[in-house]
Amino acid sequence: QIVLIFGNFTGQIGDPSGKSEARPLKTQQELENNAKHYLEQAGKLLDVDKIEVVWNADWLGKLTFSDVTRLASVFTVQQMMERDMFQDRLKASAPIYVHEFMYPLMQGYDSVAIKADVELGGTDQTFNLLAGREIQRSYGQEPQSVITVPLLEGTDGLKKMGKTTGNYIGINEDPKDMYGKT
């Protein structure tokens, strides 16, 4: 069974992976609009009638402070600080917010909640995907297999393809526009 998780809880935090500064917090409306578009895009690759779509606020929103403390005890501050983007910010005296440390914990808990056996993500998600394995192990679950795929280079030839940087080719774009961007 393919399960597509929409991060209407984690999306509020924003994934710090590869970011030189904290991401702005998103509203529920923004997250719901994004999810609608993501589902349309997923429909280009998957039969959305045959997959299970879930929202991670359904389980993350129910965690107590005690639950979050247990989750946080799986990792150390040193492990979080080993990540390149935090090292870069530390050297630049740029802020690192505590909520950014929570993102991989919450994404990892998604794997516990759905009892994932495989998780797929980009290479920029390696830490978060492996966090899921550790969290599953700490909850007595069999750790999931992790599959990472390389990130696509953006149309600028410099950064990874992304909507934020405007260097992307949208999956729903007209084929002529797509071709023109390559």
Can you annotate each of these PLM segments?
Residues 16-32:
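A charged helix-plus-loop insertion that forms the helical arch/lid used to bind
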